[in-house]
């Protein structure tokens, strides 16, 4: 779904406007969206893009592809070695970069992640759920949580605090690169929630 969301963001960065029909399907009459889709389709047909039921990090770790597009939390699933199909291995030299963007346009980024909800319940349970959310998003606790999981911080000050964070898991440098990339995106990209139908 990350490549498809990138197609959508590319179309929006080019000024497509709404590209969904009232039934939630893509509007194939939207010229800007169609061109973004065809750019992706041509790259796919030429073998420049791999679409698979595997996560992109799996294909990076087996040496099948040189790069992948995925969520920030995918950092949890990278090994420190690349293991090729023939069993040979070499050290992983992971580099984490900001999400690709359209040249000359305002950068957009997908905003997705863990959703917390509380079902209609008793007042006491609702208060307990609210207390848990406040506890989890308290600045220092949230900083520790996101630094261990690859999630984007929910507190603005956490981006500044994470620059000097010293408890990242291994590979430490990859986590530092991840949060440097996320900080760039937080400062210069506009987040968009995924569409709801």
Residue map of PLM features:
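Stable alpha-helical elements in mature extracytoplasmic
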Residues: 3, 7, 33-40, 56, ...
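Flexible glycine/proline-enriched surface loops and loop-helix/loop-strand junctions
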Residues: 16-26, 61, 111-116, 186
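Extracytoplasmic/periplasmic substrate-recognition and gating elements
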Residues: 41, 45-46, 84-152
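Extracytoplasmic/periplasmic solute-binding protein
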Residues: 1-25, 65
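C-terminal capping/gating helix-and-loop segments adjacent to ligand/active sites or protein-protein/ligand interfaces
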Residues: 110, 173-197
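Short helices/loops that flank or line small-molecule/ion binding pockets
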Residues: 45, 54-68
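Paired acidic/hydrophobic, glycine-rich loop segments that form the ligand-binding mouth/hinge
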Residues: 66-71, 77-78
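Glycine-centered hinge/linker elements that transmit conformational signals in sensory
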Residues: 22-53
């Amino acid at each position: 779904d990350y490549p498809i969301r990138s197609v959508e963001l590319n179309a929006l960065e080019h000024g497509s406007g709404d590209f969904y029909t009232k039934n939630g399907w893509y509007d194939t009459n939207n010229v800007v969206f169609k061109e973004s889709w065809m750019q992706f389709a041509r790259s796919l047909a030429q073998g420049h893009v791999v679409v698979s039921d595997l996560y992109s990090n799996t294909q990076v770790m087996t040496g099948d592809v040189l790069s992948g597009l995925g969520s920030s939390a995918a950092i949890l699933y990278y090994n420190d070695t690349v293991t090729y199909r023939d069993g040979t291995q070499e050290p992983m030299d992971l580099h984490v970069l900001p999400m690709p963007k359209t040249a000359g346009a305002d950068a957009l980024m997908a905003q997705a992640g863990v959703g917390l909800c509380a079902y209609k319940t008793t007042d006491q349970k609702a208060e307990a759920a609210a207390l848990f959310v406040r506890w989890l998003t308290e600045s220092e606790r949230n900083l520790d949580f996101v630094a261990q999981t690859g999630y984007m911080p929910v507190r603005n000050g956490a981006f500044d605090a994470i620059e000097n964070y010293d408890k990242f898991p291994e590979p430490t440098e990859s986590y530092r690169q991840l949060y440097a990339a996320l900080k760039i995106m937080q400062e210069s990209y506009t987040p968009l929630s995924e569409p709801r139908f």
